[in-house]
Amino acid sequence: FIIGFDGEKDGAGHRIVDFVTRTGIPAAMMGMLQALPKTALWARLEREGRLIQGEDAAKGVNQTNLLNFKPTRPIRDIANEYVDAFCALYEPNAYMDRVYSYYLKMGAPRWKAAAKLPSLVDLKALSIVVWRQGIKRSTRTRFWRYLFGMARNNPALLEQFLSVLAHNEHFLEYRSIVQQEIREQLESLPPEEPTAQKELQPV
């Protein structure tokens, strides 16, 4: 999901979170729009004088970087919506709800892998998930309810369910990185000039 398109209305971040929640997508990738060199978007923005970095500085990384052009609405509004939405998507309870909903709807796999003993790495990962999500955090009640729900209703996907729950340990760390790096970039921006749209509004 991308935020920062021309003509985008306020609340785009909230609409993305609402859509992901209603559809039950477990891991939703999200970023701010970046113009890449030698693309039609880059050429148009260059003609319009809206690029704010040259080709050498264009990174293409859209999760921890601000837009590299002047958008049609305040960049601070877009950035704050993005950070709020990213954090909401990977809030532990919300993420767990989506993962459970997703795996309950999935049918059992048509093939069955050969049974094997879990490795030490697997056991360590499982212990981390159980400790953090099933004991330490506010997700503890959900965790055990959903775990037993999966074991009862879709046991063939129980291992995958736990594996995807474990992914949120990475996303939770990445949330902090996104917040910090975007906030630092916002602090370094000069004050924004009023947009033409605001200037034309009646007094």
Task: Please give the residue ranges for each predicted region.
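Terminal low-complexity segments of carbohydrate-biosynthetic enzymes
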Residues: 104-105, 112-203
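A structural motif corresponding to the C-terminal lobe/cap of the Radical SAM core domain
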Residues: 1-126, 130-137
